[in-house]
Amino acid sequence: MNAQAHRAYAEFLPEPYRSDSVAEPVSEWWEWRGRRVHMLRAAVPEAPVRILAIHGAGGHSGLLWPAVALGLRENVDATAVDLPLYGRTIEPDPGGVRYGQWVDLLCELVHARAAADDRPLVLFGASMGGMLAYEVAARTGAVAHVVATCLLDPADPAAPAALTRWNLPGRSGPRLLRWIDPVGGRLRVPIRWITHMDKMSLDPELSRLCATDPLGGGARIPLGFLRSFVDYRHTPPEDFTAAPVTLVHPAADQWTPPELSIRFLERIPGRRETVLLDNCGHFPVEEPGIAQLAGAMRAILAEAGGSGR
């Protein structure tokens, strides 16, 4: 269960971050449109700020928890969610899950939590979760800061080739997915067949763990989900005014090149910042990048919480 799965991922962190991540989160459940959504939580009622961690394709809350734990020293109330198809969330119709449902779920979760808790909320999105965090902030207006390891815009012609194993030119990949969708959209295939799970980390052992984890990279996704992502039109960055955005992109990412995310970020007219995590792969665990990530998170959480630190 991913309530303990974070321990396996924490083993790949250098100290002191490995020890920091051993604090046990607890499981919470939320009913949403006939689904039981699972979350990991470290509740700190007296904390001045909240953080919600959002995984991407092939991830889950346990995989992200060691990254979330980087902020636990900073007196933060932390949650990581399992989106449908991943983790322990109970999905009644796996073949029908589409990217837009992920956006809707997260927006409603943010609104539901905000109605009961008015502390500032920071969204931390990893991989595909970066664009989810961005879109949720744009749609809800209830987010103090967006932190993303990746901002891969499917409208960018280079994005599908970076996302998938299919080295098809330009928009050929999306056209193929649209052609397949009416008859094969519900067909579920292992995510590692479609995406570069082998490039998840610079450490082959960590990449192998991610690719075979039945709660994450070892799960199956419907082809229609991938089609729904490449066809999804996010809020144009030129129109984004919801919150400051910090891109914390691994500098040595072999899966999604940093320049794709940077050129999206630079179209945002408001406050934005790029922090390149030196020596880090797509799943950042290496020094000195992990220390750079921890430092960026400390500064963002302190500012969002109004502590002035």
Residue ranges of predicted features:
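An N-terminal hydrophobic leader/cap segment in hydrolases
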Residues: 1-31, 35-42
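Short beta-strand/loop motif that positions the catalytic acidic residue
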Residues: 241, 247-249, 253
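Conserved alpha/beta-hydrolase
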Residues: 68-92
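Short alpha-helix in the alpha/beta-hydrolase fold that links the catalytic acid
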Residues: 243, 257-266
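Alpha/beta-hydrolase-fold enzymes
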Residues: 131-215
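Catalytic active-site module of serine/aspartate enzymes centered on a nucleophile-bearing elbow/loop
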Residues: 271-309
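The serine-hydrolase catalytic nucleophile loop
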Residues: 57-69
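Active-site glycine-rich loops that stabilize anionic/oxyanionic intermediates
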Residues: 56-60, 127, 251
